[in-house]
Amino acid sequence: MITITDPGTALAVGNFGFSTSFTQTAQGTLALRVDNTGLHDSVWVGGTQVNLNGTLRAVVQAGLYGTTTTYKDVLATSASVNSRFASVTSSSAFFNATATYNANSVDLILTRQGFGAVAGETQNQRAIGNALEAGYSTALTGATATFYAQLLQAGSLRVLDQLSGEGTSGTQNTAFNSGVLFGQTMEGQMEAWRAGNRGGVASDAALGYAAEQPRGPAASAFAALKAPAMAQPRWNAWAAGFGAGQQLAGNASVGSASLSNRAAGGAMGVDYLVNPDLLLGMAAGGSSATFSVDDRATSGRLEGGHVGVYAMQRFGANYLSAQIAYSHFNNTTTRTITGVGTTEAAQGSFGSDQLGGRLEIGRSFDFGITAVTPFAAIQAARLWQGAYTEASTAGAAPGVLGLSYAAQSVTSLPTFLGAKFDGRVAFGNDMVWSPFVHAAWVHEFRPSRTITASLVTVPVSAFTIAGASAASDSARLDLGSRLALNRWWEVSARVTGEFSNLGQSYSGMGALKASW
């Protein structure tokens, strides 16, 4: 591409001059600087022929522009203008450029587009763009005027994504995932009990000493000598560790970017068998998680603490389980902002609280060493994020592009419909191996994740931005096994995967349990 421009000189009419004819081919670009006062570069052709083609490009200089600015005679000639540029463009995403062709000259017209009204904007770009437009005026002064003057030079609408803070919404999915992982440690203990790994009362047949029916009258004389029933363990203490990773795709029309997060942590708890059909327990744990939204140059960390209680009631082959958990997170975020003046780094720190619970019902069907259990569950969580303001820096100086975030409440409400397949193999000496496979369809009724923010140093109204959402529908698969070493010790492990059109997540968990 051949480009004709002269950025090293002051704006002035006629600063390009050709004494001969002027011809621009289809591959050529005539790039002329223009400013908000009407000054512009221009070309004077003294020859007898002007042949136009290619691109006429307006290179927008810093300043506050009105709706329309006309630049007269950006190309003038003593000859006639009988051809046209193939295209007329602007270096800024927020201007449309057109040309007017006269007998001996070409004029350039620059029309400013509202920050929230540019063709092709996403939902998020329109949201912050409309807020910025409401605060714009050619009469602005000081730092606000400088901000808008630099913004108007941006060559891509992506600058609005950089300003929006959209990537910080990644704290929400990350917090929900950490809470779910803690809940799965409690769920695992209830599942172990439901599947029958807790020991039981021994019968005569189990002892192998005599038939269940007496063989003669003398048998009654020895009835009192029957082996006593083995007491079922009533207490469990357990500890578990977990780790997980998730990838979620963004939404192009909304304007959200892809999110990835990682989490690891552990929990410990104790439960009590109130009666042969009722289990009650409590647990506490901690987690550490990170997230990254690469396309928004945003990352963060969440340090969480969790406490919860759980219960399961059996009604013959039916069961009902419930759990409730509270989590507190210390959140930190970091993002890099480019495209408006000097690159800035913005950091935020805030606390958040989460309350969640799960209710599940199911019925087991026994097929010898295998049981099949259809089940349905609902899992609700509410996350409250505190308000906070970023501290931004531009090199060693304070920044001007940081955001102030409003307090936010976000809900997750997935439901589960599926089946559990539990095996059971006894090896003797109270050692039992129990492999299992659980499969479910998961539907999330509240997948949206949003933030509401405003610029700290620029007086504009708040705007709401949507981040990467949770998947509305996904398939979940659990694979694992439990090994009861004897009546007092059990180890277990499982891996879980969720798969959807937006991405996938994987988690792993291991646990050790002592019973007495």
Question: Language-model features: where?
Answer:
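Flexible, solvent-exposed loop segments that connect beta-strands
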Residues: 252-254, 294-296, 340-344, 394-405, ...
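Outer membrane beta-barrel translocator domains of Type V secretion systems
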Residues: 143-371, 469, 478-480, 492-516
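Residue-level detector of buried hydrophobic side-chain packing
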Residues: 30, 49-50, 71-75, 108, ...
